[in-house]
Every structure is written in C-alpha cells, then in structure tokens.
A protein has these predicted regions:
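A short glycine-/small-residue-rich loop at the edge of a beta-strand within enzyme catalytic domains
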Residues: 272, 296, 300, 327-334, ...
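Helical hairpin unit composed of two closely spaced alpha helices linked by a short loop
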Residues: 288, 298-319, 324, 329
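A beta-strand-loop signature enriched in Asp, Gly, Thr, and Trp
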Residues: 315, 320-365
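N-terminal localization/anchoring segments of enzymes in phospholipid and broader phosphate metabolism
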Residues: 1-278, 283, 287, 327, ...
Length: 441
C-alpha cells in the first residue's frame, strides 16, 4: 500500500510529487544509524537469551526470544505496576514522583505542550534542576511548543533536547521519522509509559472533550530497560556514544521470586530490521486461545495484521476492537471505517467509544498478557515512528485491564454488520480514498 501510494502521487503530480517524496517518502538510512544503535545496545546488556522456562512464561517462550533477539531487551522479574486510565490519575502520580526524585529525571515525549499542566511539569523540573538533580528532557522535533519551551528552560539547569528538530519542516528529510515515545524514568527506580503526552487535553480540557487513555507506572528490574531505551534516544539527539558507566545493565531474571510480575519493554522504529511491535502483536494474536481485546485510536492495520485478526475470528476467538466515535485527526474516522467493515462481516465485535475520545493503545490476550504503550495500530507507528510498548505476563494485571475494558464497553456503541452495510456509496468512496492515504496520515 505504501509503494502504491507513492506511485499514485508521482504519476498524478510528477514534479511536485518528486519533492513530496523527497521529504516524506525516503527510507531511513538504516545501516548507518542502526549500526550505531546496535553498538550502544550491546554495551549495556547480556549476550544470552533468557531461559524462559518458568511455567507462566513457557507459552510465550517463542515471542520472548524473538523480542530479545530483535531488540536486545530482556524479560525481567521482581516488578510491580500501577495502571492509570485517566489523565487525572496519571498526572497526579507523575508530579508526585518528580517531587520525590533524588538523583536524576529522564523524560522523553512526543508532545509537551506549554499549557497549564505543561507549565506545571516544567516548573517542577526546573525546581529539581536547581536542587542539583540531573534533569534530561527529550521532545520530538515537530512539537508545536518547542520554541517557547526552549526559552522557558534557558539557563535553568534542565537539559532540553529535540529529536530530529525541524526548524523548516519542508527542508528536513527526517521529517517523516518521529519520536512518538512517552517515557519518564526517575532515579532508575520508577518509570512511566503509555498513551499520555504532556498537555491539558489529556485531562479532558481540549476541544475534543473527555480523554480516555492508558498509561502505567512500573517499579523493579524492568526500569533498567526503560533507562536503556532513554539513553538510546539521548545518544541520537547528542549524536555521540555514551560512556559505559552511564549505561544501565539489565538484571538477570530471578526465578525464585514466586510472586514476580514478568515484564518486557520492547522498542520499534525505522532503525530496526523488523517492525518489532507489529510482530509482537501478530504473535500474541496467533497464540490466543480465547480472546483478543484491542483498544486503539487509529485502526489502520497492514495486510498481515489484518489477516491475522481474520484468522482469529474464523477460529472462534472472541475478537473485540474499540475505536473512537470521533477523530482527533482529519480523515482518521473514515480510514477506521474502511478496515472494520470486513472484520464486522466475519464476526468481530467492534465498539465505538462514545464518552469523549479514546486514545488508549492496549492489546489484551486471553486475560493473561497485556501489551500497553505508545504504538498505534497503523503504518506510521509500525514502520516510521520510534515507539515503545510494555508486555506484562501476569493474569492479575491482565484482569485489571479486562475490568476496565468492560467499563469502556458500557459507554460504547456496538456496531452491527447489517447497520454498517447500509453506508452510502459516497461514504464508501471516502473510506477507500482516505485508506490510500493512510500510510502518511
């Protein structure tokens, strides 16, 4: 589809299309950047693959091995987790942990708005920097508040970096590759990840209204992997390797901890040979025996993921997909419509969330494994953006997400194929046209 789109643009607009392709279609220079990234990763983690023969992990051994081999991020034990399903919960806990920080605060966000909550977080970071803490903040280069933030943080002690900064967007060939990650790591003891950026809209104060999202706070051995991922991004924005002593080492998996929560942080991006998070989702769905519960604001699966979902439906798996009833970006509503049509016909349970906007990015399998993070189910997240997701292999944690999913169903509208089939020809044309544009949305 991505190739077809560019052929269409270059045929329709041969001269203008060339320049559009130059800035939006060029492939990331994988060899040069990937070699640097892999070199960094090898400096800071074990060479062996985890022996995941623990009873709770045996079923997922193939997936765990693939994720370790492809990302060099190992599964860990001795962890705990707190999920947050509202912006209020998330920001209250984020502010509390920042205030309690004693050594270092590392933050990496796709969006950091200079609004009420953004200024509040910024002031806390400045306060901590003045106390003598190391404070590092990485923000994606297309963030609209970057200029104001740069002025605000000047001479405060906060180390501010922009990921692939774009002073003049149309003259930046890296414009297409964004840091879509949302991470906070404090004192190498606690970390946050999920769908929420820094901004008032995540508190439901934007034009779109109530904002339903999911982020988690984690404690334990897995935090070392969060640190590792952050320093990977820091090495890119600094354009230099980091000294060995700066790089955390992931602890060896300890099987004697009977009540351990097993977690694995996974990363994906144009620097990798494979679309790791997409592969993670496909493997999880293929392993499902009872249920697949998905929440995503953007449902634009590639052919392989779509076929995997179809196979699951036809195999009798309870496939539920929840998408927004309103869109925060132009065209997304119609693209979502295109892809759910076939799944509805085959028997999927599709829900439109009606209490505002749902931005949650979760995949729940058999009430046993939950994958939560920054990755949407679309081409951009799978192939172009830098993303992170956290796999949690624990029934109790998975059950907490299941309970929330059913709460969301209660305020959602279930779609039926008969009603959906009554869409007008004009609506179907819009869906098909916008679907063609989906790789660059």
């Amino acid at each position: 589809l991505y190739t077809i789109l560019w052929i269409f643009i270059l045929t329709l607009l041969p001269y203008v299309g060339f320049f559009i392709y130059l800035f939006f279609g060029l492939t990331f220079k994988k060899k040069r950047v990937a070699n640097k990234i892999y070199k960094i990763k090898k400096l800071r983690s074990r060479k062996d693959v985890t022996n995941s023969d623990k009873k709770e992990l045996r079923r997922w051994k193939g997936l765990i091995t693939y994720l370790e081999m492809s990302t060099d991020n190992h599964i860990s034990a001795n962890n705990n987790i707190e999920p947050y399903f509202t912006g209020k919960e998330f920001f209250e806990n984020l502010k509390k942990e920042i205030k309690n920080a004693r050594e270092v605060i590392n933050m990496e966000y796709f969006v950091f708005k200079f609004d009420n909550i953004g200024k509040e977080i910024a002031d806390l970071l400045i306060e901590k920097a003045k106390e003598g803490l190391e404070v590092n903040l990485i923000i994606d280069g297309v963030n609209t508040s970057n200029f104001r933030l740069k002025r605000y943080f000047k001479d405060t002690g906060v180390n501010l970096y922009f990921f692939f900064k774009t002073y003049i967007p149309l003259f930046n060939i890296r414009l297409n590759y964004r840091d879509h990650r949302k991470l906070t790591i404090i004192d190498n003891k606690v970390a946050f990840v999920g769908g929420m950026n820094i901004g008032d809209e995540y508190l439901g104060k934007g034009k779109i209204g109530y904002w339903r999202d999911t982020s988690v706070k984690v404690f334990g051995d897995v935090v070392a992997t969060f640190e590792k991922e952050f320093y990977f991004a820091l090495s890119i924005v600094k354009n230099k390797f980091l000294k060995d002593e700066k790089l955390p080492v992931e602890p060896t998996l300890k099987y004697e901890e009977e009540k351990s929560i097993y977690m694995q942080l996974i990363s994906s991006g144009p620097n990798y040979e494979f679309p790791v998070i997409r592969d993670n989702h496909i493997k999880l769905i293929q392993e499902a025996k009872k249920s697949v519960f998905i929440q995503t604001p953007y449902f634009v699966p590639d052919d392989l993921l779509l076929d995997t979902l179809k196979t699951a439906i036809l195999s009798g798996i309870d496939v539920k997909i929840m998408i927004p009833n309103k869109a925060d970006h132009l065209f997304i509503y119609w693209v979502n419509q295109y892809y759910i049509a076939d799944l509805l016909r085959l028997g999927a349970n599709i829900y439109r969330y009606e209490n505002g906007f749902i931005h949650s990015k979760t995949l729940l399998i058999d009430e046993e494994v939950i994958s939560v993070g920054t990755c949407n189910l679309d081409y951009r997240s799978f192939y172009l953006n830098f993303e992170v997701n956290l796999n949690v292999y624990n029934k109790e944690v998975a059950n907490a997400f299941k309970v929330q999913y059913y709460k969301d169903i209660a305020i959602s509208k279930k779609l039926t194929f008969n009603d959906f089939a009554k869409r007008s020809i004009f609506t179907k044309i819009k869906e098909s046209v916008f679907r063609l544009l989906s790789p660059v949305l």
